[in-house]
Amino acid sequence: MSSSPMLGGIADRWRELHGQDSWNGLLDPLDLDLRSSILSYGELVQATYDSFNRERRSPHAGACVYGHGDLLAAAGASAAGSYAVTKFVYATSGLPVPEAFLLLPLPSLLPPAWSRESNWMGYVAVATDEGVAALGRRDIVVAWRGTVESLEWVNDFDFTPVPAAPVLGAAAAANPRAIVHRGFLSVYTSSNKDSKYNKASARDQVLEEVRRLMELYKDEVTSITVVGHSLGASLATLNAVDIVANGANCPPASSSSSQPPCPVTAIVFASPRVGDGFFKAAFASFPDLRALHVKNAGDVVPMYPPLGYVDVAVKLRISTSRSPYLRSPGTIETLHNLECYLHGVAGEQGSAGGFKLEVDRDVALANKGVDALKDKYPVPPRWWVSKNRCMVKDADGHWALHDFEQI
């Protein structure tokens, strides 16, 4: 078994692994380098969950616990040395959304809250020089966080269809019937003049940073990878097409760079359906755009919204129910959990059936945020917690909450 999700021939094969040929011949059986690449990107998404402050008694609820410099290492991402976080992304919504998506400090808290309107929604990162050597190019990653609470949001979210024009750029004229999910689009495009963190929308924050990085590395071979899980997967889908449709994957027109537009790939896990068939056609019309959707058998979220919406991505089907390490049948929670998804990717055997870990991925991670492992494994459920829940004894002998570094 490979000892690291970053080992293998990724540097030499990155265009193929990034979807240049729509992953033809790579999914069944699942190519080892592609498997490793998916796991690495999945860990970059998992870092958004492991770094998110979900303690509503904290004035920093809804923010990131860590700073740019230590987020990936503190969250345990194996690619921590291969990427540097360059920007945090914050989101709000112009529509009412479930608490599972925007988590805010308790109204009764005495210390001033960091924000009453916004949440930390992810980050932009770029490959370090070490990462370039491992990846074969300067990869820009946009990682979107999903929900942190129950799955009840699938029944409560606003599934009203609205025109997809805001993310289709000039292609909107050729695709006037393309529609997307109003709730997802609202979180992606909303700003709030009263919020310090969302005077610009999440969309504008990301596009500005991607353009800055494309300018900085205009003479290098680059790629853009947009990743997310659950609701974050929906935002990643909107973001990926938006980047291409509005030319953010191109070197700046004012530069003398000879580099062509770089490929943009969305790698998403457990994604709800974002748009209709016309949106899928619009998505497919961009030659530099690809999307791969990892979908677990039995997970209900990819079936929502149930009517009028379709999946735009190439599907990689997995089944965690085949794993001999996990309880079977799984629960709604475990079948949707990202760490369980990554466990499934590590062992998926496709049409051959069965389950075999092809990379050395610790099975204990499956219990990181849920109760998925069989009882014979000595791993407590939901074991990922900050030491003393971020309570620290100060020099004066009093305990205080230290749960943020950088906003």
Swiss-Prot record:
The active site is at 230 (acyl-ester intermediate), 230 (charge relay system), 299 (charge relay system), 336 (charge relay system). Pfam families: Lipase_3. GO terms for biological process: lipid catabolic process. GO terms for molecular function: phospholipase A1 activity. Keywords: Cytoplasm, Hydrolase, Lipid degradation, Lipid metabolism. Disulfide bonds: none annotated. It comes from the Eukaryota. InterPro entries: AB_hydrolase_fold (IPR029058), Fungal_lipase-type (IPR002921), PLA (IPR033556). It is an enzyme of class 3 (hydrolase). Its EC number is 3.1.1.-. It is found in: Cytoplasm. Its main location: cytoplasm. One of its GO terms (cellular component) is cytoplasm. SUPFAM superfamilies: alpha/beta-Hydrolases. The keyword Hydrolase applies. Acylhydrolase that catalyzes the hydrolysis of phospholipids at the sn-1 position. Belongs to the AB hydrolase superfamily. Lipase family. This is Phospholipase A1-II 7. It comes from Oryza sativa subsp. indica.
